Amino acid sequence: MAYHFLFAAPYGAEAGTEFLHRLLPLLDMFFMISGFFITTRYGGELRDVADYRGFLRRRIARLYPLHVIVTLFFVAVALLAMIAGADNYPWRQELEAMPLHLLAIHALGTTDHLALNFVSWSVSAEIFCYAAFPLIIVAMRWKGLPGLGLLTLGWIAALEMASQWGVFPSGHWTTADTMGAYRAFADFCIGACIAGVVARRALDIRSHLPGLALLAGALAAMIWQLPTYLVLALLAFSLSATALAETARPNSTAALRFAMPVTRVSFGIYLWHPVMEFLFLTVIWTRWLEPAGIVDFYVFWLLPMAATLAVAMLSDRYLEKRFGALIAGPRPRPACEARLASA
């Protein structure tokens, strides 16, 4: 959020965005965490096509409603710009991207530029990971953790070859966005490997200090711009150590429960912040407040940050769950409950 907001800053923007850009591998950590949780939760449950269909439907129901809502907001902006004849707004490019966004395939290489709901390439990438999840299931049931490791290494090797052949517009798979689905699945596979490590409990880690130390090392490596593979390895080791400590002592993070109202809407914060950026910074700040010089940017930007958080919490409560339930359909009954009903 701060990274994108800084582009509107009248001073400090170049230094601030350059510094925060170094932390972008944290997005890879998000996909690793997702791979870990999905594998832990569903790795033993998907046994046939019906299970997979239900899984995919429920996961899409979690992401798709808010993605569509935000996308349609920017479609409306593009239509208004077209009607107003705003030549400074790329409305034609935005409207051309609409079908790709609504189909959530804009991170699969169907376009070479970000448009409309630009941060939602990660939503497209996450849905791709869900669709490809059977590959992880097959590898896991074939050879367990070694099978997951082979899948991960094979996928990364293929991405590295594609990078050498110039397939990725960004130059390398680790910085891909319009083809970010393939990058995300590599991280997702790493998360699945972490799930395998934690399930085996090969190491008895009970303190969160090793995980925090490894995370600090990963952040330092990002800031110092050390090799990306080192950063990814440190992130993976950090998540592994943290997950081992958390599963060994489930109550060890009880003190952090106060932050749950915010952390549970992190997805909403991520998707809503471009809307707040447009309303508060592109419109209110750029058109009126900056020319008037009545408030400092770094005071004003607290308002769109607070608005993003508030809207994300309201959206989670009143929009996402209701629309998501329409897509997900009724939850499957437990097997024992189904047997009782049929008796």
Q: Where on the chain are the PLM-derived regions?
A:
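Conserved beta-strand->loop/alpha-helix structural units within folded catalytic cores of enzymes
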Residues: 34, 64-68, 124-138, 322
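Lipid-exposed faces of alpha-helical membrane segments in multi-pass integral membrane proteins
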Residues: 2, 32, 69-76, 99-102, ...
